[in-house]
């Protein structure tokens, strides 16, 4: 159960850009590099944006335009659950005959958890079920939009200036055909894209983005600097004396969810558009191969590529821990699980003295010197009690039990510290048959070339010492 409910008890070391210790269930395995990968040593790529409520899929440009929020779904400002649309019947007077009334349907937003409704803040009911809901206007919207446009233009000017300085340093290496006059014409009139050749790396490619004409045509945006105010608006006279009704005061979380308004009273809470979620792909930074790629459809939970480490690396679990005492040898039972369908040979090795990875060990560990053979994974054999087990020459002092692709192994632990938790480290050496190896001719193929030996650094947290 240590890998399911207490995954932090068994950690694997990832030798990436920086060393990361994480449970095997949170790691990936690159079949091309034959190394473990964590979320900190992979590239994250956004595949699609979608709404978790209505499952509407939208491209990245549209999601950016909508500020990564769904236009039709709302979150409750009180409890942050999804709001549902409720229908009700209202009586309205006919325009032709005011004495007569007609029944029409009206729609409003309601929360099924905290009973908040859009009528609580005075939002008018709508005649259609989706869209057209009233949203509060922010007084500083125009100011913020103008500031964004100003800084976007400023960033564009700085980028052009940086590219121009790079070009000036490379002008000494220009071909003779591109004289100073040619460079000036291309730079001034934006002819770089027309003269650009399909061959990458040419000097015209560097000139393509240095168009001054676009910057000259754009009207320079000017903003007014903010003016400091000497006097602030005074507080109301009854601010300190009037009684406070806590049911009408918003919580800190409710205010932080609406940073543009930060409502103080519950009557100022307006529904917020639901945030979009993303489906992302993970790519190895060394070989550029995908480690995880989900299906594009938001309703699908399947993956096109999912190279999780638990499907390729033998998994270590803690089965039983005896009473651990200072400088007394104890026997710990571990289970090794083979996740692949072929036989896997495993050898447990002690960490060498001065190993830079062995920094958290607080106990001396003694592992079995013999090589262990793990049977291949067979889903049908796990539920077949009458199936004959494979015969392996196991040492009863080393192997406690064997069932399907699992093996129970004894290790001996001697705590070296008088207090604190007991942590042991060892190396797990196993063979791996790489099915993603490049295809070669039959005469050049080596039967043992695809099998490689990998070594994993494993740390076990065995709990506190007993007095």
UniProtKB/Swiss-Prot annotation:
Keywords: Acetylation, Coiled coil, Cytoplasm, Cytoskeleton, Isopeptide bond, Phosphoprotein, Ubl conjugation. The modification Phosphothreonine is found at residue 414. One of its GO terms (cellular component) is dynactin complex. The modification N-acetylalanine is found at residue 2. Its main location: cytoplasm. Pfam families: Dynactin_p62. It is found in: Cytoplasm, Cytoskeleton; Cytoplasm, Cytoskeleton, Microtubule organizing center, Centrosome; Cytoplasm, Cytoskeleton, Stress fiber; Cytoplasm, Cell cortex. There is a cross-link at residue 222 (Glycyl lysine isopeptide (Lys-Gly) (interchain with G-Cter in SUMO2)). Subunit of dynactin, a multiprotein complex part of a tripartite complex with dynein and a adapter, such as BICDL1, BICD2 or HOOK3. The dynactin complex is built around ACTR1A/ACTB filament and consists of an actin-related filament composed of a shoulder domain, a pointed end and a barbed end. Its length is defined by its flexible shoulder domain. The soulder is composed of 2 DCTN1 subunits, 4 DCTN2 and 2 DCTN3. The 4 DCNT2 (via N-terminus) bind the ACTR1A filament and act as molecular rulers to determine the length. The pointed end is important for binding dynein-dynactin cargo adapters. Part of the dynactin complex that activates the molecular motor dynein for ultra-processive transport along microtubules. Together with dynein is involved in spindle assembly and cytokinesis. Belongs to the dynactin subunit 4 family. This is Dynactin subunit 4. The gene is DCTN4.
